[in-house]
Regions:
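Rossmann-fold NAD(P)H-dependent dehydrogenase/reductase core
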Residues: 1-171, 247-256
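C-terminal helical subdomain
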Residues: 23, 133, 157, 182-222, ...
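Short glycine/proline- and charge-enriched loop/turn segments
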Residues: 115-122, 174-182, 219-222
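Terminal hydrophobic/aromatic helix or amphipathic segment near a protein terminus
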Residues: 162, 172-194, 251, 256
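C-terminal amphipathic/interface module of NAD(P)-dependent oxidoreductases
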Residues: 226-256
Length: 256
């Protein structure tokens, strides 16, 4: 990255979103090194086909895609507040609009949040678990944006488009068929550079400096599934996420 950009001020912090101790350690290291944070882009994600649990006992799709950004962002909120104006950008997925594994047959089936089975313990379906975690990102974005109004921190979410990354390895496609699938899908996929454009826009555009609590697709505001706007469900999801990440609810009063 240093060679490609010519910018020597690039730092790397080890961080495993499937390990809450690793997230806490990364946040502590950041606070030790820096006193300001103006942009936080929560971009990492994974589609885990097998019903695996993290060392914390959390279903992997939920842990990496939702609880990871949730915990990291909460741990960095104090610094974001003191650095305002600041921006939080959360990368979601179009899977929130259609949680089916095969999307070109029949009607779309929007993702849903099941508070009684957030970890997909009753019946694990990889795409449904992934879509639920991505919907949780969007709902958490709306909830946090509303509570940070007036602080100088904006919070937005986005779908980057279908991007040519290694995430397809987690879609349950048999390994011998992966090369064929990759070649066949390449004409329909955006490059990683193009896929990053909306996140960069939300992180840097002066025109979006005051925009918050929005969901963007291909650089423009878009509607997310109707259930995502339910404030009671957002609050219940936030509380459940605090429990799963061992965050004290009282922390809200300290950081909001």
């Amino acid at each position: 990255m240093v060679a490609g950009t010519g910018n020597p001020r690039v730092e790397v912090l080890p961080l495993d979103l499937a390990d809450q101790d690793s997230i806490r350690s990364a946040a502590a290291q950041f606070h030790h090194r820096h006193h300001a944070l103006h942009v936080l882009v929560n971009n990492a994600g994974a589609h885990i086909a097998a019903g695996r649990l993290t060392g914390d006992g959390i279903e992997m799709n939920l842990a990496v895609n939702h609880l990871g950004w949730f915990l990291l962002t909460n741990l960095l909120l104090d610094t974001l507040r003191s650095s305002a104006p600041a921006r939080i950008v959360n990368v979601a997925s179009q899977a929130i609009a259609d949680a089916r594994a095969i999307t070109w047959l029949g009607r779309p089936r929007p993702a849903r949040i099941d508070l009684d089975d957030l970890q997909s313990e009753r019946a694990f379906h990889p795409m449904a678990a992934y879509a639920q975690a991505k919907l949780a990102i969007v709902m958490g974005t709306y909830h946090l944006a509303r509570h940070l109004e007036g602080t100088g921190i904006t919070v937005n979410a986005l779908h980057p488009g279908l991007v040519a990354t290694g995430i397809v390895r987690g879609f349950g496609i048999p390994r011998p068929l992966l090369p064929l699938f990759t070649r066949a899908s390449r004409p329909f996929l955006a490059t990683p550079e193009d896929g990053a454009s909306t996140a960069i826009q939300l992180a840097t555009s002066p025109d979006l400096a005051a925009v918050t609590g929005q969901y963007f697709v291909r650089g423009k505001p878009a509607r997310s599934p109707e259930a995502s706007y339910n404030r009671d469900l957002q609050e219940a999801l936030w509380t459940a996420s605090e429990h799963l990440t061992r965050l004290a609810p009282g922390r809200r009063q300290e950081t909001w």
